[in-house]
Each structure stands twice: as structure tokens, then as C-alpha cells.
Regions:
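SAM-dependent methyltransferase catalytic region
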Residues: 1-171
């Protein structure tokens, strides 16, 4: 396709946003839909300390479109409190970014192109996470990353990895 580069194709590139500063999703006088609030609480739990784990996080598929519409519809109702004002000014904008990130991390793609990490010594929280979530691949972060990126790819999609001969020396 000779016109590929002239099309408005947006790559899905992002830095991971954590939810460590968000204590809870619900806010009295603002959030009132239990189903949507449950999605918000899930996202807060899922992205706690997320920078340590990065794109390896398994994000469940929810109706994030409906959740985004819910976030866009939220307004202050009733008595204005310090908590509700803080929530609307601070938490709400963060949740809009987080749901966009969740959409990217729960979708499947026609093309996945990346540069896997080349470290085989895992420590701390990352080591614990890899053992729990990716046990068959726990020996090397490179293997875990390759597996996860095949998961991001559609069945008939393409995967491209920047992989020098390091793979020959994986233990």
C-alpha cells in the first residue's frame, strides 16, 4: 500500500500511569452507578505500582467505552465538599487517562512491534509478579515479554521484535 504513511494511523504508545495516589474511586455526591464504580475500583487496584510491572499487567476486558461515557457524564450534585471538589479536579482527570490506558492494554492488535528487555535477573515485586502470572516463562523477562506481546496480537496479526542474538544465551 503506497499510501500507508499518508493515512491518519495513530500508534498506541504510552507511559504507564499508576494509581498509587488514588485511594478509592467512589465519591459521595459524584459517583452513583455501582457497576461503573466497580470498574473504577478494579482499575485502581490493577494499576497500583504499575510502573514496576509495566505492559506485562493483565488487564481484564470491560466495557470501557461505557465507563468512559460515565466518567464524561459525572458532575457534582448536591452539597459541594472538599472531598468531592478534590475528586472532580484530581481523581476524575486521572481516571480518564487510566481508562484510555486500560483500553490499550486490553485490546488486540493487527501489528505489535517492540523491543523486549534483555534481563534475566528479576528481583522484588517484579519477580513475585512474574512467578504468579507467567510461571512457565519465569526464567527470563525476555521470555515473559515475548509471550505477553503475542497475547496483544490478533490471531492473524503480525509481531515484530528487535532481538539481537541475545535469545541464544537465555538460560
Amino acid at each position: 500500500d503506497r499510501r500507508f504513511l499518508t493515512r491518519e494511523i495513530e500508534p498506541n504508545v504510552s507511559t504507564i500511569i499508576e494509581t498509587n495516589t488514588i485511594a478509592k474511586f467512589t465519591c459521595e455526591g459524584v459517583t452513583n452507578d455501582k457497576e461503573q464504580n466497580d470498574i473504577g475500583e478494579y482499575l485502581i487496584r490493577a494499576y497500583k505500582d504499575a510502573k514496576e510491572i509495566g505492559s506485562l499487567l493483565p488487564i481484564e476486558k470491560y466495557d470501557f467505552k461505557a465507563f468512559t461515557e460515565y466518567l464524561n457524564s459525572l458532575t457534582l450534585s448536591g452539597q459541594l465538599t472538599l472531598e468531592s471538589d478534590y475528586w472532580v479536579e484530581g481523581t476524575l482527570p486521572e481516571m480518564k487517562k487510566i481508562v484510555k490506558q486500560a483500553v490499550m492494554m486490553s485490546d488486540k492488535y493487527a501489528v505489535v512491534c517492540t523491543n523486549p528487555p534483555y534481563m534475566n535477573k528479576l528481583e522484588g515485586q517484579l519477580k513475585k509478579f512474574v512467578i504468579e502470572e507467567y510461571k512457565p516463562y519465569k526464567g527470563d523477562l525476555f521470555s515473559v515479554f515475548m509471550y505477553k506481546n503475542f497475547d496483544y496480537c490478533k490471531p492473524d496479526g503480525y509481531s515484530a521484535f528487535m532481538t539481537p542474538f541475545v535469545w541464544m544465551f537465555i538460560k
